Amino acid sequence: MGHGGDGKTSLVESLLNIAGVTDRVGKIADGNTVCDFDPEEIKRKFSISTAVAPVEWNGCKINLLDTPGFFDFESEVQCALRVAESALIVATGKSGPGVGTEKAWAHCEEHAMPRMFYISKIDEENSDYYNSLHKLQKQFGVSVAPIVVPIFEGNRDTVGIVDCVIRKAYRMEGNKRVEIPIPDNMKDRIDQHRAALCENIAELSEDLMERYFAGEEFSDEELIAGIRQGVKDLVLAPVFCGTAATGIGSYALLKGIADYMPSPDEKPVEICEDEKGELIEINCTPNGSTCAFVFKTVADQYGRFSYFKVMSGEVKQDMTLVNKRADANEKMGHIFTVCGKKTTEVPVIGCGDIGAVSKLVTTKTGDTLSMSVRKVELESIEIAPPCYTQAIAPKVKGVEEKISTGLARLRDEDPSFDTEFNPETKQHLISGAGDIHLDVLCSKLKDKFGVEVTLTDPIVPYREKIRKAVTVEGKHKKQSGGHGQYGHVKMEFAPYAEGDYLFQEKIFGGSVPKNFHPAVDKGIREAMEHGVLA
């Protein structure tokens, strides 16, 4: 997570390359990154949806969820947070923590989520790692502790990194990491960082505290275990750094994620109700009753593709699960692991892992799939209501039905926008998180469903109100030979209850024939629809 443009997608590219998932590091400018594969992302050069990118490191599978940084797509971040065990907050060495960094930290606080920091772009001009580190510590507290620090040479050229825990330095040679001696001018600083880490983990237990005050040095293994516990207990936020373009720091970050971030079975147990209304625990155990949570949906003219996380048990190919919300069975059919847009069919998705399935009929983002013997519904995803509205209209007539169908499909994958018809202004309205959000939706309508639309400011439905009673009169005279026509009526208008209408007749002696009365009533009602002034 982090602010837009801070380098999250580029970092994922580097990690995938270092882990051997890809044979080259994609670039956003070239439109060939693994996570920004949507045509809109390639065109706009930024992420608009959460992408899944798994890697394996030291026998540990890590599912990376690359989230958008622009606030218009905040709902994608919320969906990712719902299934993540921990968060990596990215901030740049150039500007330090931004508004997106603050929001990411606030999300972690709200979800009680373990977190680490990564300071990106440390090799770029005007980048200052230690200034950014100081800002992070000042803003988020002493729990922010550096694990990896950069090695600079000459005019602040980044040539490598030092791991303060194991006290080893490395530089990159091509795609390989090579160990080098720690520069003499950095040894004191590395010792200080390591001592600060020891002090932090000493607070985790009385035994560690006694050993710390006795002057006993912790081993590397004890320090790693202590940092992991501190991260899990939310009292420590380790800081890593690097540059995605050269891979400096990427090895250390993968090792840090595997060593310090909690695994799915360490996540707090979820509590929910079964079909009898009894509270039950959902434990991340492979032999438990199958329970999967759908956190993302991709929809087009061909159907849905649903991303899910296995919360308990395992999901097997062709098994049938129950959607308690929709009270419907769903056959899992073919199931896949996903890396960007690439899918690989597998027979089973294990507990704690992320997979995808196609052609679910009733299941939407935020739904739970479980066994028929234990129907459960986990807490869904809380999406902020839309706050920006525009009027949407087709460029050509006759495609209104295609627009409605397309928007309904798009809402399957993006529940953060809404549509409605305003009967007063006769406009179709679309509401989202901002102008970029709505512009992306319109582009998707064109690309996926072949419908071009325009957005305009909605008409303001001004309301008029009669302030006081008034009497008006009208006369009709027509003389063209023979019998002439003459009419003279008076009408009284007066204030009435808000939104209500009362039509009364005060005709005496049939002076105005009754067959004219309904036409007068109808005319008044039509005038009320549009108003007199507005």
Which residue stretches match the model-derived regions?
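Structural and coupling elements of P-loop NTPases
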Residues: 1-534
